[in-house]
UniProtKB/Swiss-Prot annotation:
Residues 559-568 have a biased composition (Low complexity). Phosphorylated at Thr-212 by STK11/LKB1 in complex with STE20-related adapter-alpha (STRADA) pseudo kinase and CAB39. Not dephosphorylated by the myosin PP1 complex when regulating its activity, due to the presence of PPP1R12A, which prevents myosin PP1 from dephosphorylating NUAK1. Phosphorylated by STK38L upon stimulation with IGF1. Ubiquitinated with 'Lys-29'- and 'Lys-33'-linked polyubiquitins which appear to impede LKB1-mediated phosphorylation. Deubiquitinated by USP9X. This is NUAK family SNF1-like kinase 1. Pfam families: Pkinase. Residues 40-53, 394-405, 519-530 have a biased composition (Basic residues). It comes from Mus musculus (Mouse). Residues 378-393 have a biased composition (Polar residues).
Length: 658
């Protein structure tokens, strides 16, 4: 299945389509970059009656949509397994939807890449459009992650390299996908990536701006949700950042329970990094930059050291960065950026603590992978309002993709899906129609809400269940194009819109208390989630403190005279806890213990140039932390003779980048 597409045998002339000279190019203009000659991708076009059942044996249904369904089938003569997508024309009520369906066929027929679903044949008559396409037997990448909960770094890099390779090929040929998500990424027999669903894709030019605010909310970039014009590739780069975060951590970076919180998180690039760090966190932060000019391009991603770690060659054949250093030096630079970012984040938190009412704004902690919505499932504003003058229309900012839909409106297409390129004299099917989408989305206006959203991560009374929650229900397949409406769009009709799909965690129960109220928990030194937690500090960043002498009384003889079963239930004490009765002889209870520095201060960036100060016994780390220090990111430097020179070189590169 992988490799160049094979044209199927059949009646009728074969029409070879490609980006150079294709009908789509004649309509939408030239591509963004010169297209290199490549092997022609033959696609049969049939415009006459043809009985498919004579050539294909239809099997089970893979997915359903508004306009038809996708079935698995086997070609009788060759035995090749294909996916057959049938579209009923009588269900297409809007001409623009037909334009986008034909555009998807043109673009997918023009692309020829081993990690993009191929189209073999297209049949069309007055009633139907039937597309014979490549079949990916392993299904969606979403389901693959759902079964495994979390992928290894090696497997994640394998998948991400193939995704980046396909997206780079699209951008090089002037095509932007605009709907990259786990549901639109399929797997073949050999677990190789196959990108599908080009229903929202379009050609772009570097000197033009697009104004179609489409895509899935959980993967949408800040310029999409805020209704700002964009060039195109930067939208795919943002979606790649969300995909990489999800592949590594198994959760979504932006996971607000309502559309206002989601817009605020995306607009500020506000996401939580799990306590278990990954070497790809620097690349994720680069791809999730709010400013599109500072965001990583597809060439930056393809040449990043993490993407190419363990491989002899880069993902793409594009030019690498000049004077690129070794991956080791890149990791030092990446660590430096992370350290400065954490310091700035801590300062922002301290400033937010001083503001009144800061604890009232809660940022829901994302802990689960959610099924994303199709673009036309977003709530939309009514279009039957009173017409406004052109001056008022031009003064309004265009709307984003997260809009409220009135209950009386049930159109199958999205006004946010209408395509427009900011350039004059375009043919009518591709002209700008942004006049239909002018309602701006209200953004949170309180600065306290933006600055203190992270203050109550630990104060939420109820947290969503960690992991990937999947509901077994019939839904659309990744083969289906985005203009088609899914079954769960009615969930977005209320005022408090829930962006998450059927796999989302339930919202917090109001009966259990507000999110900023502290949960009832017995005081004392109790182990929580295999780490010591004080309720307000990240457990991974906190060193366990020495217990008081009062807390070291034998469990069987409590000081207050109450039996152990009432004073401290055994269910809240971990078997491997340091405070268990079998481990009291391991505690160090010297009264005049000299104060020791924390690990972070011992190996901080500022003291790297004065390593000789750490040779005294007073400043050496405690023995139980030696293994943790050896396993940290600084262990990469232990095999080098001159640590100071490497760090100085990294600082010079960081200063040049800044």
């Amino acid at each position: 299945m992988e490799g160049a597409a094979v044209s199927a045998a059949g009646d009728g002339p074969a029409v070879e389509t490609g980006l150079p000279g294709s009908p789509l190019e004649a309509v939408a203009g030239a591509t963004a970059a010169p297209v290199e000659p490549r092997k022609p991708h033959g696609v049969k076009r049939h415009h006459h009656k043809h009985n498919l059942k004579h050539r294909y044996e239809l099997q089970e249904t893979l997915g359903k949509g508004t306009y038809g369904k996708v079935k698995r089938a086997t070609e009788r003569f060759s035995g090749r397994v294909v996916a057959i997508k049938s579209i009923r024309k009588d269900k297409i009520k809007d001409e623009l939807d037909m334009v986008h369906i034909r555009r998807e066929i043109e673009i997918m027929s023009s692309l020829n890449h081993p990690h993009i679903i191929s189209i073999y044949e297209v049949f069309e008559n007055k009633d139907k459009i039937v597309i014979i396409m490549e079949y990916a037997s392993k299904g969606e990448l979403y389901d693959y992650i759902s079964e495994r909960r979390r992928l290894s770094e090696r497997e994640t890099r394998h998948f991400f390299r193939q995704i980046v390779s396909a997206v780079h090929y699209c951008h090089k040929n002037g095509v932007v996908h605009r709907d990259l998500k786990l549901e639109n990424i399929l797997l073949d027999d050999n677990c190789n990536i196959k990108i599908a669903d080009f229903g929202l894709s379009n050609l772009y030019q570097k000197d033009k701006f697009l104004q179609t605010f489409c895509g899935s909310p959980l993967y949408a970039s800040p310029e999409i949700v805020n209704g700002r014009p964009y060039r195109g590739p930067e939208v795919d780069s943002w979606a790649l950042g969300v995909l990489l975060y999800t592949l590594i951590y198994g959760t979504m970076p932006f996971d607000g329970f309502d559309h206002k919180n989601l817009i605020r998180q995306i607009s500020s690039g506000e996401y939580r990094e799990p306590t278990q760090p990954s070497d790809a966190r620097g690349l994720i932060r680069w791809m999730l930059m709010v400013n599109p000019d500072r965001r990583a391009t597809i060439e930056d991603i393809a040449n990043h050291w993490w993407v190419n770690w363990g491989y002899k060659s880069s993902v793409c054949d594009c030019d690498a960065l000049p004077d690129s250093e070794s991956p080791l030096l890149a990791r030092i630079i990446d660590w430096h950026h992370r350290s400065t970012g954490l310091q700035a984040e801590a300062e922002a938190k301290m400033k937010g603590l001083a503001k009144p009412g800061a604890s009232e704004v809660v940022l829901e902690r994302q802990r689960s992978l959610k099924k994303s919505k199709k673009e036309n499932d977003f709530p939309q504003s009514g279009q039957d309002s009173v017409p406004e003058s052109p001056s008022k229309l031009s003064s309004k900012r265009p709307k984003g993709i997260l809009k409220k839909r009135s209950n009386s409106e049930h159109r199958s297409h999205s006004t946010g899906f209408i395509e427009g390129i900011v350039s004059p004299a375009l043919p009518s099917p591709f002209k700008m129609e942004q006049d239909l989408c002018r309602t701006a989305i209200p953004l949170p206006s309180s600065p306290e809400a933006d600055m203190s959203g992270k203050l109550s991560l630990k104060q939420s009374a109820t947290m969503p269940k960690k992991g990937i929650l999947k509901k077994t229900q019939q839904r659309e397949s990744g083969y289906y194009s985005s203009p088609e409406r899914s079954e769960s769009s009615e969930l977005l009709d209320s005022n408090d819109v829930v962006i998450s799909g059927g796999l989302s965690s339930p919202p917090p129960d109001p009966a259990r208390g507000t999110s900023h109220s502290l949960s009832c928990r017995r005081k004392g030194i109790l182990k929580h989630s295999s780490r010591y937690s004080d309720g307000g500090t990240d457990p991974a960043l906190t060193r366990p403190e020495m217990p008081t002498l009062e807390s070291l009384s034998p469990p069987g003889v409590p000081s207050d005279g109450i039996s152990r079963s009432y004073s401290r239930p055994s269910s809240i004490i971990s078997d491997d806890s340091v405070l268990s009765s079998d481990s009291f002889d391991l505690l160090e209870l010297q009264e005049n213990r000299p104060a020791r520095q924390r690990i972070r201060s011992c190996v901080s960036a500022e003291n790297f140039l004065q390593l000789q100060d750490f040779e005294t016994p007073h400043n050496r780390p405690r023995p139980q932390y030696l293994k943790r220090l050896a396993d940290s990111s600084f262990s990469l430097l232990t095999d080098m003779d001159d640590v100071t020179q490497v760090y100085k070189k990294a600082l010079e590169i960081c200063s040049k980048l800044n």
